[in-house]
Amino acid sequence: MRRYSRVVTPPEKYTLGHHASVLKAHTWRTVANSAQYLAPRLAPGISLLDIGCGPGTITVEFADRLAPGRVVGMDSAPEVIEIASRFERPNLDFLVGDVYALPFDDDMFDIVHAHQILQHVAHPVAALKEMRRVAKPGGIVAARDVDYGGIIWFPPISGLDDWRDIYKRVHRGNGGEPDAGRRLKTWALQAGFENVATSASMWNFSNAADREWWGSMWEERVLHSAFAGDALDQGAATQQQLEAISRAWREWADSEAGWLGMPHGEIIATA
């Protein structure tokens, strides 16, 4: 496994940052729970670029499934690439890079993949154009993003309504689009793709273990992650509001009736 560094242009601000409560969720991600829509396209020998790979848990699965095909994981955060680099595979590389200026020649990869990335960039169409550039003719660009406006939960807890409203305000204040899932198709069309297959899937948290895992993460995130600081700095929330939201997540996690669904839009666009 080799690691490379490239000059990275200053990125849009990542709303959640890389607090331990955020990386806890990122290391949970797998092909099964986050890229199942792409699974039928994965075959040995295929090359793949994983943009915004984070700590690399999905990327290393790609490397195992596609071997001996080359897999490259890329992220704009050097500290996250350091974490991902613990995965050692002969066909796997990690690098620090910029989605707007990918350090590859044209027509390099069979698949260019981005999970939960386009929601965080100010220019998703430009990012998709650059992803298309490095995809081989007939290859695919695959993307999956959550849609915060579509998240539903039970029981009704007013603090969670406040959470979503404040989160969306902060996310947009940082240059992103929290309702990206519903926009993936139109962004791909604007990027020049003509053949865009769409699908949708949902993360669901309901049993006691899942509620505790998800609820405790947000209970902590709203007080200690980059989101908390930005909410205060942007005037989107007061400290008292954030503390109330943290308690709301604890209330939801402790409720036997607790249920939450997070919808995701998905696209497979042919280059």
Each model region followed by its residue ranges:
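C-terminal helical/coil "lid" or tail adjacent to the Rossmann-like core of SAM-dependent
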Residues: 10-14, 20, 197-260
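Conserved alpha-helix/loop element of class I SAM-dependent methyltransferases that forms part
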Residues: 27-44, 61
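Class I SAM-dependent methyltransferase SAM/SAH-binding core
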Residues: 49-51, 55-101, 126
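A short acidic, Gly/Pro-enriched loop at the edge of an enzyme's catalytic core
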Residues: 100-111
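A short SAM/SAH-binding and catalytic strip from SAM-dependent methyltransferases
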Residues: 110-124
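A short glycine-rich, Lys/Arg-flanked "PGG" loop and its adjoining helix->strand segment in the class I
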Residues: 125-140
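Conserved catalytic/acceptor-binding region of the Class I
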Residues: 142-211
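Core SAM-dependent methyltransferase catalytic element
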Residues: 191-194, 262-271
